[in-house]
Regions:
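Conserved N-terminal ligand/cofactor-binding loop architecture of enzyme catalytic domains
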Residues: 29-148, 195-259, 455-461, 470-501
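A donor-sugar binding/catalytic signature common to diverse glycosyltransferases
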Residues: 360-407
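Histidine-anchored nucleotide/phosphate-binding helix
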Residues: 11-28, 32-33, 180, 301-317
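A short, glycine/small-residue-rich beta-strand->loop->alpha-helix junction that serves as a flexible
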Residues: 7-17, 168, 289-293
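Conserved nucleotide-sugar donor-interacting segment of glycosyltransferase catalytic cores
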Residues: 150-206
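Nucleotide-activated donor-binding/catalytic signature segment of Leloir-type glycosyltransferases, i.e.
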Residues: 341-358
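Conserved catalytic-core segment of nucleotide-activated headgroup transferases in glycan assembly
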Residues: 248-344
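Long, C-terminal catalytic modules of enzymes
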Residues: 275, 405, 409-501
């Protein structure tokens, strides 16, 4: 089989692709590795277009290039340079008024807008940049032009090499999103390579076949397949599924930050025990799901979470026996943009809602345990609440949405009916919950599609630097870390962060 690997993703993501490439090369596959060669000049790692980051990235590629077996051939995008095409692309005029317009932008029938927006938002966490400011538009236009040129080069190399399968990181960010679209257009098999930290901090690599890792239907099918594996007993599946939820509620590490760390058990809002019914809203980090794809956009009833929360508060404003509590996601506590700061003002606008800030020590799990209804926007607190036999109303895309464990209204009218129904019961589907828990618990321990990613971390001038297997300069990891540290201090282009008023 002929595999085409795109290492054009910057540090540290290229390390995931390199390890995966080595794995398949040792199986005897014919491997073509595509390196950027400093040709594009902008990616998630280098949004400020710092030429020294490009230099270090190229050095990084050359390290693992020298260690690859003979059946791995490297091709550089720089070798495909076409100045005439680049000059032609730079003349393209993009017409957009909002970031939602940018999502829809295509080049030669290939969407480049989602990759642009996803990468920008991942870097800045700004969901609404002021594209009317001239220098903001110049920055975004330049990024879009680079993505057009990158797409041109990607198609050119795929057409030339005619691979059976292509590999790239994640599928969401700018270097890879167009590859998803190209693969679909050409009916070509593709693999999204993803990294994950499992229990105990072990870094591993997971592959997602012909789907992005965020695809809800695909992930549901994986959960069903894991559950249907007859090599594992039903008893063990149930034990592992229950263990996942038990560990989560006890603050055990599951690959992401521990967002309940520092929260105080039994600490609750002052008005918690006033005899009213308690409906608790857990919002999510809206920026994390903002530009994954149209699948998530279509799942939403409301354009923004704050619109949804206001709708809920207004719907229940005259039900004096119901108190609303909004727990702002801890990951938003340092965000200065209005999609977070406006949430903090909701108690001034609606008398029936108590806002609990992201940095509050109030216990999220105690809020969940004492709630009569839980409303979520796709967060894992939704499935955890369902496991605790709570009524859960989910208003966004979620990996548990198609497991039939939460109420998933499709319209505002559906939502109103769920909010005002005093006889609503929790959905009784323990097996669906255990499928979810077993999937993630098994992946964390014994998943056969995982293989380890070698890395260590060092402290340098109070900064933690992750050093992977191929992070070396002149054979030295320390020298790589030192150069990386000082390059990060160098200023490239200013990344615009102004929010539209």
């Amino acid at each position: 089989m002929k595999n085409l690997f795109f290492t054009t993703c910057g540090y540290p993501h290229m390390e995931l692709v390199a390890e995966t490439m080595m794995h398949y090369a040792l199986l005897g596959n014919e491997i073509i590795a595509v390196q950027c060669g400093q040709e594009i000049g902008q990616c998630l790692w280098n949004m400020d277009k710092n030429k020294w980051k490009c230099w270090l990235c190229n050095k990084h590629v050359n390290v693992f290039k020298r260690q690859m077996p003979a059946n791995v051939k490297f091709v550089s995008l720089a070798s495909l340079n076409n100045n005439d095409k680049w000059e032609e692309i730079k003349k393209i005029v993009f017409r957009y008024k909002t970031i939602e317009d940018i999502k829809k932008i295509e080049y030669n029938g290939i969407n480049i807008g989602y990759g642009c927006v996803s990468t920008y938002v991942s870097k800045t966490r700004n969901l609404n940049p002021d594209v009317d400011l001239p220098y903001v538009r110049v920055y975004i236009d330049d990024f879009l032009h680079r993505l057009c040129y990158q797409t041109y080069l990607h198609e050119k190399i795929i057409n030339a090499e005619k691979p059976d399968q292509i590999f790239f990181i994640n599928g969401r960010i700018s270097n890879a999103r167009s590859l998803v679209e190209i693969a679909k257009k050409k009916n070509l098999e593709y693999v999204c390579v993803e990294g994950a930290k499992s229990v105990g901090g072990r870094m591993c690599i997971d592959n997602f076949y012909n789907n992005m890792p965020h695809n809800l239907q695909y992930r549901t099918a994986l959960m069903e397949n894991y559950w249907g594996d007859i090599s594992v007993s039903r008893k063990e599946k149930e034990w592992l599924g229950n263990l996942f939820f038990s560990n989560k509620q006890n603050g055990k590490y599951y690959g992401d930050k521990n967002y309940v760390e520092g929260q105080v058990n039994n600490l609750l809002p002052d008005n918690w025990n006033n005899g009213n019914k308690r409906y608790v809203i857990f919002n999510s980090s809206e920026d994390e799901f903002f530009a994954i794809g149209d699948e998530y956009d279509k799942e939403k009833i409301f354009d923004t979470q704050i619109q949804g929360i206001k709708f809920i508060a207004q719907t229940l404003i005259n039900r004096t026996n119901v108190d609303l509590y909004l727990r702002i996601h801890p990951n938003l506590k340092n965000i200065k943009y209005r999609y977070h700061t406006d949430l903090l003002k909701l108690s001034d606008e609606y008398k029936n809602i108590t806002v609990i800030s992201g940095d509050s020590k109030i216990s999220s799990y105690d809020l969940m345990r004492g709630a009569d209804k839980i409303i979520v926007f796709g967060s894992t607190m939704g499935v955890e609440s369902a496991y605790s036999k709570k009524v859960v109303i989910n208003l966004a895309g979620a990996l548990y949405k198609y497991l039939n464990v939460t109420y998933n209204p499709k319209t505002k009218e559906d939502l109103c009916n769920l909010l005002t129904n005093d006889n609503l019961k929790p959905i009784d589907n323990k097996e669906g919950l255990l499928k979810y828990g077993y999937y993630f618990q098994r992946k964390n321990f014994i998943s056969p599609i995982f293989f380890p990613l070698h890395y260590k971390q060092i402290k340098l001038f109070n900064k933690t630097i992750y050093l992977y297997k191929y992070c070396r300069i002149l054979g030295s990891k320390f020298l790589y870390a030192l150069i990386n540290y000082f390059i990060e201090k160098q200023k490239g282009d200013i990344i615009p962060t102004e929010e539209k008023k």
